[in-house]
Swiss-Prot record:
PANTHER family: TRANSLATION INITIATION FACTOR IF-1, CHLOROPLASTIC (PTHR33370:SF1). This is Translation initiation factor IF-1, chloroplastic. GO terms for molecular function: ribosome binding; rRNA binding; translation initiation factor activity. The keyword Plastid applies. One of its GO terms (cellular component) is chloroplast. It comes from Chlorella vulgaris (Green alga). SMART domains: S1 (SM00316). One of the essential components for the initiation of protein synthesis. Stabilizes the binding of IF-2 and IF-3 on the 30S subunit to which N-formylmethionyl-tRNA(fMet) subsequently binds. Helps modulate mRNA selection, yielding the 30S pre-initiation complex (PIC). Upon addition of the 50S ribosomal subunit IF-1, IF-2 and IF-3 are released leaving the mature 70S translation initiation complex.
């Protein structure tokens, strides 16, 4: 099921805190702190997200304090 009607905001950030049940505190590029959970594809492929990792986060325009981690960026990559 895809969400084509809702325009999601995609940003990059750094994981600052690892919480329980696949939840993470992420500091975005603009300085905001959001609570983000791991997307299903990352969970299914057993991709580990650790403290200090750069990640791509999707935010809903309705709640800018919660997000979904959609991609773990490689170390040293700019995008």
């Amino acid at each position: 099921m895809t969400r084509k009607n809702i325009d999601l905001i995609e940003m990059e950030g750094v994981v600052t805190q690892c919480l329980s049940n696949g939840m993470f505190r992420v500091k975005l590029e603009n300085g905001f702190l959001v609570l983000a959970h791991v997307s299903g594809k990352i969970r299914r492929n057993s991709i580990r997200i650790l403290l200090g990792d750069r990640v791509a986060v999707e935010l809903s325009p309705y709640d800018l304090h919660r997000g979904r981690i959609t991609f773990r960026l490689r170390p040293g990559s700019k995008t």
